[in-house]
Amino acid sequence: MSEDSFLKYFANGVEPKKAAVLYAVQEPTAVSLFAGRTTQAAWRSKPSWYAVSKQDQTINPDLERFLAKRMNATTVELDAGHLSLVSHPKEVADLILAAAGHKE
């Protein structure tokens, strides 16, 4: 991915200097990541949580909403781009803490 595309589509919403550093240190995805086969989706039998990034330019937010609804996930919507973990750490941490405190 070009630096321009990374900054515009992948890291939109991230402070520009931080986004430039993220671009500089990224590495190619390991091909082995795509070699494995998933045999069972955990969301079919486990409670799930999902953060929809409303400004995501990498994954369409409508697709994110569809996936969250399909898995019956507890969902929050963030005014964030694809890297909501970086641009909205408190909101993402709150979602993780809610999931961690959930009793089945």
Say what each PLM segment does.
Residues M1-Q40:
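Helix-rich cap/lid subdomain of alpha/beta-hydrolase
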Residues T39-A42, R65-L67:
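Short secondary-structure boundary/capping segments
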Residues K54-D79, A99:
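Conserved loop-alpha-helix segment in the C-terminal half of the alpha/beta-hydrolase fold
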Residues A73-E104:
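Catalytic active-site module of serine/aspartate enzymes centered on a nucleophile-bearing elbow/loop
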